[in-house]
Amino acid sequence: MRGVVGVLALQGDFREHKEALKRLGIEAKEVRKKEHLEGLKALIVPGGESTTIGKLAREYGIEDEVRKRVEEGSLALFGTCAGAIWLAKEIVGYPEQPRLGVLEAWVERNAFGRQVESFEEDLEVEGLGSFHGVFIRAPVFRRLGEGVEVLARLGDLPVLVRQGKVLASSFHPELTEDPRLHRYFLELAGV
């Protein structure tokens, strides 16, 4: 399925990711069940509510299949905001929250405050230059394991990281008109 990218469509802003992919000429396939992952080389996990995403992914059999495929190296992942939380090894203060655990990162939910404290900030992204970040109840990566590369920071805080074919951002690139981060992920995934 070259040219097709899955977007986890259980909850959150999956439509915005589909639009971002469409602008790049890439077909987006909504993933709501384990069977929808068949043939995909790449999956985007959108922002939304991380607890809900985790519970539904587990309930619909998606969690185990995604974990297996990532560990085999046959699936690239891009998690934004709540999606990044779901990818993390640990969620600070929420040890029981469902998570995929494929990114060696310890993530703090809502680290920049509540919805009313959302903000936008220009970031320097390694290899891309200046990129406009939209932070909405954004998480932050408090600790990173071996092999996790920081691609962008807000002050001293990592807000965009990569480990192999797993990419995770605290911010929402899908809420901008800038396609570069989605294009970077497509290249990472070989799509």
Swiss-Prot record:
**Coiled coil start-end:** none
- Active site as annotated: C81 (nucleophile), H172 (charge relay system), E174 (charge relay system)
Molecular function as annotated in GO: glutaminase activity; pyridoxal 5'-phosphate synthase (glutamine hydrolysing) activity
Catalysed transformations (reactions) = aldehydo-D-ribose 5-phosphate + D-glyceraldehyde 3-phosphate + L-glutamine = pyridoxal 5'-phosphate + L-glutamate + phosphate + 3 H2O + H(+); L-glutamine + H2O = L-glutamate + NH4(+)
Hey, which pathway is this one from?
Cofactor biosynthesis; pyridoxal 5'-phosphate biosynthesis
Q: Which Gene3D superfamilies match?
A: 3.40.50.880
Q: What's a BP term from Gene Ontology annotated to this protein?
A: pyridoxal phosphate biosynthetic process
Which keywords, in A-to-Z order, does the entry hold? Answer: Glutamine amidotransferase, Hydrolase, Lyase, Pyridoxal phosphate
InterPro entries, per database record: Class_I_gatase-like (IPR029062), PdxT/SNO (IPR002161), PdxT/SNO_CS (IPR021196)
Free-text function comment from the UniProt entry: Catalyzes the hydrolysis of glutamine to glutamate and ammonia as part of the biosynthesis of pyridoxal 5'-phosphate. The resulting ammonia molecule is channeled to the active site of PdxS.
According to UniProt, the name of this protein is Pyridoxal 5'-phosphate synthase subunit PdxT
Q: Tell me the gene name.
A: pdxT
